[in-house]
């Protein structure tokens, strides 16, 4: 790596640490102040729908932010040490910077009830993460530490934002009082769940990523918990969630066994 690329990587790594700290600060203020006098969870309650999982499911954000802290710190270390074989390229670092900007933007737009604009920010976040994930995947990391510090954070974040995007789309439709072409709400929820599961299967089979579908399993467990606790129990939604979890779990095990054989070959 020439000196210009090395300097660019170090600069972007440092910027990303600052942007990540900004994300943590904004998210803390979102519920600490709270921004616009209402918490993120209370806002979700304004747009009730059957796709939103139980509140405890959102505790995954704590894990995500811990992993992202590891990601940005490790990336700065790799940049300084010029570890070009395991360092994501500058364009991918810029993509991570964009995820931070879109993340913070989403918080403000959501809290000021600009639901449609918040969806645009969420889509920007998702697209940035897709690009970042693809670049990380191209590195073909084999070392355990590199996979934990680079692939794990990006995969989990990508998975959860995929789930969040589906939830955000649903919130926009609720806000617009969209009739869903006459499709009942629970049927629309089933469609969204099937689309989510199909997306998880696609990423699993195409990129052999075991982590991405695990996030969907976590989200669907949250849906089961929330739907089971309601007065009106939607058994079709619960059954679909269980079925999706079972299919994803089986495919994860099969893919994991194949990967193990490939590594041993």
Residue ranges of predicted features:
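Membrane-interface transmembrane-helix boundary segments in multi-pass integral membrane proteins
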Residues: 8, 52-58, 181-198, 225-250
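Membrane-interface capping segments at transmembrane-helix boundaries
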Residues: 8, 77-81, 134-140, 253-265
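Alpha-helical transmembrane segments of multi-pass integral membrane proteins
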Residues: 18-25, 95-106, 122-133, 150-168
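Alpha-helical transmembrane segments of multi-pass membrane proteins
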Residues: 20-37
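Short aromatic-rich membrane-water interface segments that cap or initiate transmembrane helices
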Residues: 45-60, 148-155, 178-188
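Internal transmembrane alpha-helix with an interfacial aromatic "cap," most often the third helix
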Residues: 71-83, 89, 93, 97-119, ...
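Membrane-interface helix caps and helix-loop-helix hairpins in membrane proteins
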Residues: 105-119, 176-183, 204-207, 229-235
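Central hydrophobic cores of alpha-helical transmembrane segments
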Residues: 211-222
């Amino acid at each position: 790596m020439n000196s210009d690329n090395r300097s660019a990587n170090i600069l972007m790594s440092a910027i990303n640490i600052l942007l990540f700290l900004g994300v943590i600060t904004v998210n803390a203020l979102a519920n600490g102040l709270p921004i616009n006098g209402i918490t993120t969870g209370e806002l979700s309650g304004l747009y009730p729908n059957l796709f939103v999982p139980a509140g405890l499911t959102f505790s995954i954000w704590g894990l995500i932010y811990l992993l992202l802290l590891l990601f940005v710190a490790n990336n700065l270390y790799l940049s300084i040490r010029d570890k070009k074989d395991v360092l994501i390229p500058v364009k991918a670092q810029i993509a991570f910077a964009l995820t931070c900007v879109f993340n913070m933007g989403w918080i403000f737009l959501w809290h000021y009830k600009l639901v449609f604009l918040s969806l645009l920010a969420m889509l920007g976040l998702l697209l940035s993460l897709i690009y970042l994930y693809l670049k990380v995947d191209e590195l073909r990391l084999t070392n355990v530490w590199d996979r934990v510090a680079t692939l794990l954070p990006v995969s989990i974040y990508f998975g959860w934002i995929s789930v969040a995007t589906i939830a955000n789309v649903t919130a926009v439709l609720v806000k617009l009082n969209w009739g869903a072409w006459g499709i009942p709400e629970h049927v629309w929820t089933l469609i969204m769940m099937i689309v989510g599961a199909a997306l998880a299967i696609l990423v699993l089979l195409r990129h052999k990523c075991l982590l991405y579908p695990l996030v969907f399993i976590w989200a669907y467990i949250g849906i089961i918990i929330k739907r089971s606790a309601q007065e009106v129990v939607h058994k079709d939604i619960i059954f679909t969630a269980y079925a999706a979890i079972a299919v994803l779990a089986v495919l994860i095990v099969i893919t994991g066994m194949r990967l193990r054989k490939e590594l041993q070959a």
